[in-house]
Amino acid sequence: MPNVFQNLVSCKRVFRELKMAAYNGGTSAAAAGHHHHHHHHLPHLPPPHLHHHHHPQHHLHPGSAAAVHPVQQHTSSAAAAAAAAAAAAAMLNPGQQQPYFPSPAPGQAPGPAAAAPAQVQAAAAATVKAHHHQHSHHPQQQLDIEPDRPIGYGAFGVVWSVTDPRDGKRVALKKMPNVFQNLVSCKRVFRELKMLCFFKHDNVLSALDILQPPHIDYFEEIYVVTELMQSDLHKIIVSPQPLSSDHVKVFLYQILRGLKYLHSAGILHRDIKPGNLLVNSNCVLKICDFGLARVEELDESRHMTQEVVTQYYRAPEILMGSRHYSNAIDIWSVGCIFAELLGRRILFQAQSPIQQLDLITDLLGTPSLEAMRTACEGAKAHILRGPHKQPSLPVLYTLSSQATHEAVHLLCRMLVFDPSKRISAKDALAHPYLDEGRLRYHTCMCKCCFSTSTGRVYTSDFEPVTNPKFDDTFEKNLSSVRQVKEIIHQFILEQQKGNRVPLCINPQSAAFKSFISSTVAQPSEMPPSPLVWE
């Protein structure tokens, strides 16, 4: 273990690793090696089956129902527990607490961003006394939170990992910057914020907390706390890790389970892609990044924006300039991801939206006029000018040995050109291909079922929906930036009523200054502009 004593962060990490190795040594040397691996590579996908609950050496996700196994609680150091309690009481900097869950090594931060520089890491670990917001609402009872490293960029915001000073758990902190630039961005952020607080589903990322806003005159950014996930499907697909058919089934099951819930709420995600499917070290998957999500428009005469969906996962109706689309666009994206999980490469990897459409018709054949009824004239003309193509769907069997008859059958129901004939999330979940994924998820991964001494007690509803739907009528009455700012400010304060001690960021810390200056989405992450058909 080189460079152990470079700074406080590396010291702590190595000490934690040594203690965990010593603890895991009681179970097996292999387990210690497996743990070490966790720091330096993507989280190894453990086969998703029963032993998770029974082997403490498998890192349970901090947010999971069995967050800390009784055995683990007993063996994690009493000093750390005391420190966490003292810190919560004395409002110490959260960087000092040691949650049980190991964080990745500095320099190994997941996500496109590099780890924060060493001095920032060190600053994050240094003790900072609680800083009372001069404009805060509860100055006497507020805890500071410190960002420690960037872990990713969404469509509209930066995400850092932090430690919650109230319980020492590692969580993710999303910064929504430049919220109040104009009315459009205000509305979009308010919609995303309301969605994050509305969602109550294990396969959809939701807000655990929102940081205390300053006085309204100083209110420019919003910080949302969510569960911290170790990886995402993009990192897993491009990694050398083998993916068993069990993994594919359990991932696809969870994507569709989350999507059925979103669609039941009347929400279109509009940017389903592997990078927006977060995965923790137990293979639990959550759909995230609702920066582009919106409520489904049932009035066909109302136009919808085409600034959606990363190109490779973009449904043909959007590529063809349709002004009205349904939640079937999300199912198309899932079909592309399903094929990518099987073949470990992007299914339709085109250089431009026109080429994207051409690759789709190469596979599906030339669509009928009926299937193109919502397309704009220029797009139809492009298809009709070209040669007539026959479908070549059997090529999907060559994706991998896991592309079985059942897998390809379900895939072909998702990759249908005509959105009205594409399978729904609800019907896809009833497909026999997903039976094993459902069983695996509910026997050892979910929070909705539980084990007793006599066996497993299953929930009455494996794939729940939401009632009532998400209501976006609040947007109709938003007319000025100042008005929305006041409404959002009030909304955040209401979310915190009766909640735990409010959290705020310590603006004096170096890590915070780095977080503040971190940029929004990298250019490559932004969805490309839509094609303008002549």
From Swiss-Prot:
InterPro entries: Kinase-like_dom_sf, MAP_kinase, MAP_kinase_CS, Prot_kinase_dom, Protein_kinase_ATP_BS, Ser/Thr_kinase_AS. It is found in: Nucleus; Cytoplasm. The keyword Metal-binding applies. Residues 8-132, 131-423 are annotated as: Sufficient for interaction with DAPK3. The active site is at D271. Residues 8-311, 441-534 are annotated as: Required for interaction with TAB2. Keywords: ATP-binding, Cytoplasm, Kinase, Magnesium, Metal-binding, Nucleotide-binding, Nucleus, Phosphoprotein, Serine/threonine-protein kinase, Transcription, Transcription regulation, Transferase, Wnt signaling pathway. A motif (TQE) lies at residues 305-307. Residues 29-79, 97-147 are annotated as: Disordered. Residues 435-534 are annotated as: Required for homodimerization and kinase activation and localization to the nucleus. Serine/threonine-protein kinase that regulates a number of transcription factors with key roles in cell fate determination. Positive effector of the non-canonical Wnt signaling pathway, acting downstream of WNT5A, MAP3K7/TAK1 and HIPK2. Negative regulator of the canonical Wnt/beta-catenin signaling pathway. Binds to and phosphorylates TCF7L2/TCF4 and LEF1, promoting the dissociation of the TCF7L2/LEF1/beta-catenin complex from DNA, as well as the ubiquitination and subsequent proteolysis of LEF1. This is Serine/threonine-protein kinase NLK. It comes from Bos taurus (Bovine). The gene is NLK.
